[in-house]
From Swiss-Prot:
One of its GO terms (molecular function) is 3-oxoacyl-[acyl-carrier-protein] synthase activity. The gene is fabH. One of its GO terms (biological process) is fatty acid biosynthetic process. This is Beta-ketoacyl-[acyl-carrier-protein] synthase III. The last Arg residue of the ACP-binding site is essential for the weak association between ACP/AcpP and FabH. It comes from Pseudoalteromonas translucida (strain TAC 125). The active site is at C111, H248, N278. Catalyzes the condensation reaction of fatty acid synthesis by the addition to an acyl acceptor of two carbons from malonyl-ACP. Catalyzes the first condensation reaction which initiates fatty acid synthesis and may therefore play a role in governing the total rate of fatty acid production. Possesses both acetoacetyl-ACP synthase and acetyl transacylase activities. Its substrate specificity determines the biosynthesis of branched-chain and/or straight-chain of fatty acids.
Length: 359
């Protein structure tokens, strides 16, 4: 059976940001309130589409792998903020990167999306159906934000990350995984005012990202920790064998609680939520790239990753890194210049959200 090695990695971080102090100009909050409850200090706001974020991240990953985009067999995009529903956003990314003829599909498992997509692409390689895939997670979560609601306005950001998978004979890549969904209480985390169930001929107003924070905290910590235990058992490993933990970056308190429950020391945990906020499916993809860039991931590292999202979806994965931690080549792909600040980018949405609030 072939294995699916990660041979390339890349990210796309929008240049415009909104700090906690700037958020306090929009909703009633403070830097101390946000930081103490979430660990977030800043978040990015994209001036371009989800497809453009995904394209730049994918181009960096492809260059890093040193392959020709025309040799890619599958483009899979994890997102809950697609640029278009029909046709899917992955098809536009496929066109943009020049992966001529490659299969292209979107997948939506909310914050668990990247690990779901990684599993799907890995399975196709292991089955001998394809040889090369690019797996992308890209989100414009600020598009969903109701800027009159403090609870969600402070949490989310935009960004994208990607990896290239290639068939190989030696054991590396995604070697064990556990995915699932507890739909019993799916309504504790959802977006209202969005989807084809709505009557589009009636005024809809801003979308609302609704969640029960305390309940989600408990379920996220329990679900991700238990999934990690299951994956370790699958792989016949102990926590001492794990070199790096790359958790979903939803909330620093959740990360610390999982870390405590699994007894993983600080130096083994990748954390970047402070500068990006929660980018949903993209958090793990971006964190994985930065863990390599920062030297946290080394050749042959054993990596554990876990996520929890709306649905309520969850996933945990054991990834064995390969030999290489440096790019074969570098892409010059970049976003077009942004001539606005983060606050200026969201100003029209802020105005609309506040006007829609009941008086």
């Amino acid at each position: 059976m072939p294995y699916a090695h990660i041979t390339g990695w890349g990210k796309c971080i929008p240049p415009a940001s909104i700090s906690n102090d700037e958020i306090s100009k929009i909703v009633d909050t403070t830097d101390e309130w946000i930081t103490s409850r979430t660990g977030i200090k800043s978040r990015r706001v994209s001036h371009v589409s989800t497809a453009e974020l995904a394209t730049v991240a994918a181009k960096h990953a492809i260059a890093c792998a040193g392959i020709d985009a025309k040799d890619i067999d599958l483009v899979i995009l994890a997102t809950c903020t697609p640029s278009t529903m029909v046709a899917n956003t992955a098809s536009l990314v496929q066109k943009n990167i020049g992966a001529v003829g490659a299969a292209a599909m979107d997948t939506n498992a909310a914050c668990s999306g990247f690990l779901y997509a990684l599993q799907a692409a890995t399975a196709q390689i292991q089955a001998g159906m394809i040889k090369k895939a690019v797996v992308i997670a890209a989100e414009r979560m600020t598009w969903y934000v109701n800027w009159s609601r403090r609870d969600s306005a402070v949490l989310f950001g935009d960004g994208a990350g990607a990896v290239v998978l290639e068939a190989a004979d030696t054991p590396a890549g995604l070697l064990a995984t556990k995915t699932g969904c507890d739909s019993t209480d799916r309504d504790i985390l959802h977006i209202e005012n969005f989807g084809s169930d709505l009557n589009k001929y009636e005024p809809i107003g801003p979308s609302n990202l609704l969640f029960e924070g305390r309940e989600i905290f408990k379920r996220a910590v329990k679900g991700m920790s238990e999934a990690c235990d299951d994956v370790l058992a699958q792989a016949n490993l102990s926590l001492d064998d794990i070199n790096v933990l790359v958790p979903h970056q939803a909330n620093l308190r959740i990360i610390q609680a999982i870390q405590h429950r699994l007894k993983v020391p600080d130096e083994k945990v990748m954390v970047n939520i402070g500068q990006y906020g929660n980018t949903s499916a993209a958090t793990i993809a971006i964190a994985l790239c930065e863990a390599v860039e920062q030297g946290l991931i080394k050749p042959h590292s054993n990596i554990m990753s876990a996520a929890f999202g709306a649905g309520l979806t969850w996933a945990a994965s054991y990834i064995k890194w390969g030999e290489r931690v440096t790019p074969i080549s570098v892409s010059d792909a970049q976003l077009p210049p942004c001539d606005k600040t983060g606050l200026e980018l969201v100003a029209p949405a802020v105005k609309a959200c506040k006007e829609a609030e009941p008086t």
